[in-house]
């Protein structure tokens, strides 16, 4: 088993996807798509370390330009900025964890969202997914 891991960091529950490169059916390579707490992600990575080829971490902090035009009110903007900053910190900590554990990883700039319908057209995953989980899964398939 050779795994690619996708992570969409979040303070409460990060999107997590595990993709097995050795499965013959390309449309059926996801072995896990779910939401995990920060600590559960660390445990999963540590336990599966010997199988992991690379961890792809969604790194929104690499995007220099932000668009606040659609958000009204300074208080709302401040709350959104704080939440985004906290999520970015989780991503940075996960990258540091991979570094410390000797797990190969790459920081990936997010490219956009995909619908559940579109995601399921790409693979044979039948379970429910939320946006964070789909974002994590799309990191490992390079979209």
Identify the role of each PLM range.
Residues 2-143:
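Phosphate- and other anionic-substrate recognition elements at nucleic-acid/protein interfaces
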């Amino acid at each position: 088993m050779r795994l690619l891991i996708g992570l969409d960091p979040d303070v409460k529950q990060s999107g997590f996807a595990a993709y097995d490169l050795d499965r013959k059916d390309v449309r059926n390579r996801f072995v896990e798509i779910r939401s995990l707490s920060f600590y559960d992600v660390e445990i999963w990575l540590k336990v599966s370390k010997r199988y992991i080829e690379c961890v792809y971490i969604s790194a929104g902090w690499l995007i220099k330009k932000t668009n606040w035009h659609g958000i009204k009110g300074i208080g709302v903007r401040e709350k959104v900025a704080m939440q985004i900053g906290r999520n970015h910190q989780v991503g940075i900590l996960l990258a540091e964890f991979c570094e410390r554990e000797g797990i190969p990883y790459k920081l990936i700039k997010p490219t956009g969202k995909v619908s559940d319908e579109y995601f399921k057209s790409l693979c044979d995953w039948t379970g429910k997914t939320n946006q964070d989980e789909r974002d994590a899964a799309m990191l490992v398939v390079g979209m």
